[in-house]
Amino acid sequence: MISQKLSYGDVPTSASLSSLSPGLAPPYVNGMGCMPAQPYPNLYSNNMVAGGSCMGSPSVGYSPPSTMASCMGGAGAVPYGSLPREQEAASPTSALQRARNDKTYRRSYTHAKPPYSYISLITMAIQNNPSRMLTLSEIYQFIMDLFPFYRQNQQRWQNSIRHSLSFNDCFVKVPRTPDKPGKGSFWTLHPDSGNMFENGCFLRRQKRFKDEKKETLRQAQKAQQTHGHHGGSHDKRGEHGHDKSAPPGPGEDKEMRDELLAQLHAAPELCLPEHTPLALEHYAQLKQEPSGYAPAQHPFSITRLLPGADTKADLKMYDVNYGYGHSPADNYYQSPLYHHHHAHAQPPL
């Protein structure tokens, strides 16, 4: 009978073992028909043995909760905390969790760039000094002590600090006095700059301060530079012989006169050669001064471009002698000058 009941896979069931007398029951079977988690040669794992031993046959019926608890207690359900240290160390999740528990997670902003402009940093340094005056090196030191970010790349941001001090009217350079010897001048805030930052917040200025005196000087220098630029252009034109105040020489006078005559008369028949007898006679007639002639009323007056007064009169006489006499501006289209140029402007058919 015992051999038949134990022949199923060599695994004793709780029903067959419970039918045995207490004296014949093996020592590893308890009184409630449960087996503790002990190694068994024909089982795959200890957990399977525990599960199989705790499951009773249909003939046994429902076990009380206390019995089930005792059975589960003996089944070998090991909690996470009692795992071996080797298995816990092998898990990457547990290693990450242990690292977070060992070190308090807190993000540090000490080495981040502060959200302040260089003007704000300089104002902070000056206002935090009792004398309200600091040298350039003291401003550097204050910024580096307050913000560790500026302990690196010192040359770059220190150049920006010097630029801000020099080109902002809110900062004033104060020379040293005999009672304060040392190197370098002091820097302070302008008395009229007022409170540039709202409620002590240095993130943004309310308005940009401008010194009226410095602004006036800047405008005057700007106007002077503009005037000097135009004066230089006039001097450059004077080098080419157009705006010279000194009277030109004989050779230059003749050359400029020929050039102006060529510009006035585009028609080839009016440009006379200078070495012909007709040209000599023409130059003699230019010396005659007409009566009642007003050069400024000529429609083609170029008095501002001519080098000398004598040449101006000669050229105006030339216009009169060749039919370019006085004609008002409104009668220009009825004058012979317009018809003459209009005839030459039309292309030949």
From Swiss-Prot:
Disordered: annotated segments: 82-103, 212-255
Start-end of Basic and acidic residues biased regions: 232-255
Leader peptide range in chain numbering: none
GO cellular component assignments: nucleus
InterPro entries: FH-like_dFKH, Fork-head_N, Fork_head_dom, FOX_domain-containing, TF_fork_head_CS_1, TF_fork_head_CS_2, WH-like_DNA-bd_sf, WH_DNA-bd_sf
Recorded GO MF terms: DNA-binding transcription factor activity, RNA polymerase II-specific; protein domain specific binding; RNA polymerase II cis-regulatory region sequence-specific DNA binding
Main subcellular localisation: nucleus
Subcellular location per the Swiss-Prot or TrEMBL entry: Nucleus
Keywords in alphabetical order: Activator, DNA-binding, Nucleus, Transcription, Transcription regulation
CDD domains from the UniProt entry: FH_dFKH
Keyword Endoplasmic reticulum: no
A Gene Ontology biological process term: cell differentiation
Residue ranges flagged as DNA-binding region: 112-203
Cited function: Regulates the transcription of the sericin-1 gene via interaction with the SA site.
UniProt protein name: Silk gland factor 1
Organism name: Bombyx mori (Silk moth)
Lineage: Eukaryota, Metazoa, Ecdysozoa, Arthropoda, Hexapoda
UniProt gene name: SGF1
